[in-house]
Amino acid sequence: MTVVPPPAEGAVALHRRSIDYQAYPDGDDLVVVGHLTASRPWADGTAAVATVHDMELRVKIRTDDLTILGATAVMHTFPHTECPGIESAFAGLVGLSVVRGYTREVQARFGGPRGCTHLEHLARSLGPVVIQAVTSRRALAVSRGESEDLLAGGGGTGSPWARDSCHIWAEGGIADQKLTAGWRPGTGPYPSPALVTFLDRDHSA
């Protein structure tokens, strides 16, 4: 395996792409704001343009089924005068649910010449942000004593949105086994102790 070292100290990047998401409560729903900037750190902003893209995507999500209720795309900085003409197309996100199949549907609707590469990227990456925001809202309720279980609403067997989302949440995998052994997300140390810790505890009980 080839180990890639970090860039040399003081090296100036050729390109910087920054993506940020913020999720806010909106009654029972969520509002997620995605922001993308692309810049050239070597440029002085005079002889050469420093910021080449600055774009924003705002969506409203119904938390019951993770369906998009509203979507607004805004281009603040763009390379062609005509670029903002595609902003309104992203209202086509409305009605989609950010569960399995969402990424494929976004690519089908907005990929390539049907959309904007950068706004499509913001839209495509929404899924994990929404899932984490829902989990964070539950964690907030636990921290306030309003709930005892981070999985409230998930049937007590794990978030249906987390299932098969990664190697930890594979069906029958590490998270499932920890849940069976009594672990509840949002409780105890962070990160969660290794699975063997829970299994040993189970055997000694």
Label each PLM-derived region with a short phrase.
Residues 7-10, 14-44, 52-54:
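N-terminal intrinsically disordered, cationic/polar leader segments
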